[in-house]
């Protein structure tokens, strides 16, 4: 039996689009931090789409609850080879 493993080094990435949602709703990072009970630095990392190794689902749930949005509104999957335009 020939077992082989397929390794895909390029699988795309997840982009945090929290800034877009916040800007549309006219809410500041300070205001969102106060409403969610999260520290400003956490909100700011998501707002700036800063490199993070994992998304905290509790943080994401609080943000979506306060902004009355879906996770798909603040996270976008970008396939490999596609450039953001």
Model-derived regions: residue spans:
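A short, Lys/Arg-rich alpha-helix, primarily the initiator
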Residues: 1-28
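Residue-level detection of the helix-turn-helix DNA-binding "recognition helix"
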Residues: 23, 37, 48, 79
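Short alpha-helical "recognition helix" segments of helix-turn-helix
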Residues: 32-33
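Recognition helix of helix-turn-helix/homeodomain-like DNA-binding domains
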Residues: 38-53
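Short, basic-rich loop-to-helix N-cap that marks the start of a DNA-contacting helix
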Residues: 50-62
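Short C-terminal boundary/hinge segments that cap the last helix of small helical domains
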Residues: 68-83
């Amino acid at each position: 039996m020939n077992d082989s493993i397929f390794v895909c080094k390029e699988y795309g990435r997840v982009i945090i689009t929290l800034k877009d949602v916040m800007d549309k709703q006219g809410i500041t990072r300070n205001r969102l931090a106060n409403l969610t009970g999260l520290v400003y630095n956490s909100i700011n990392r998501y707002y700036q789409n800063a490199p993070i190794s994992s998304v905290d689902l509790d943080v994401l749930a609080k943000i979506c609850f306060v902004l009355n949005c879906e996770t798909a509104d603040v996270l976008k999957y970008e396939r490999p080879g596609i450039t953001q335009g």
